[in-house]
């Protein structure tokens, strides 16, 4: 598939997604060994967990924060390819699709030491989400 056609599909998917996600943010109930984060948008409220993944780096536990945003259903192989290609272009962002015809998710992963989970970390997540949204808006 040509890059031009690929970008056309990606733009269509992104525009649909942006219309649905008028507002979203990341916040935590309580920082700690395990905390819950939420993503809110116009259609959907999802819960995700922040879990110690048992990796120890320099004597410190690590965490992975994943932010998932609901995407329109993937209708074809071309849709899926467009989404995966977008993921390659966005640093730190992964697009996950189980199979064609099944909803995908846009995920942002931030890794760092658990004891540094703070408002600054959540603010950084919000900045990355804003960058991703701006990228889609520019397509």
What are these regions (language model features)?
Residues 1-51, 55, 74, 89-101:
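Charge-rich, low-complexity N-terminal segments
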Residues 5-13, 75-79, 121-131:
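Short amphipathic alpha-helical segments
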Residues 17-20, 83-90, 125-139:
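Conserved short hydrophobic interaction patches
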Residues 35-37, 49, 64-66, 107-109:
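Ordered hydrophobic segments in well-structured contexts
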Residues 40, 67-71, 110-114:
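Short beta-strand-to-loop capping motifs
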Residues 50-68, 120-132:
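A signal for specific C-terminal beta-sheet/loop modules enriched in small/flexible residues
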Residues 60-105:
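Short, internal acidic amphipathic alpha-helical interface segments
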Residues 92-124, 131, 137-138:
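Well-ordered alpha/beta subsegment
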């Amino acid at each position: 598939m040509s890059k031009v056609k690929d970008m056309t599909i990606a733009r269509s998917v992104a525009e649909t997604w942006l219309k649905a996600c008028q507002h979203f943010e990341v916040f935590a109930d309580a920082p700690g060994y395990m905390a819950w984060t939420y993503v809110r948008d116009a259609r959907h409220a999802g819960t995700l967990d922040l879990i110690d993944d048992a990796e120890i780096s320099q004597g410190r536990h690590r965490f992975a924060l994943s932010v998932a945003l609901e995407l329109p259903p993937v209708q074809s192989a071309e849709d899926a390819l467009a989404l995966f290609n977008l993921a390659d272009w966005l640093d730190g962002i992964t697009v996950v699709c189980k199979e064609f015809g099944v909803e995908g998710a846009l995920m942002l992963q931030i890794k760092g030491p658990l004891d540094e989970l703070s408002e600054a970390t959540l603010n950084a997540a919000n900045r990355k989400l804003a960058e991703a949204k701006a990228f889609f808006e520019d397509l």
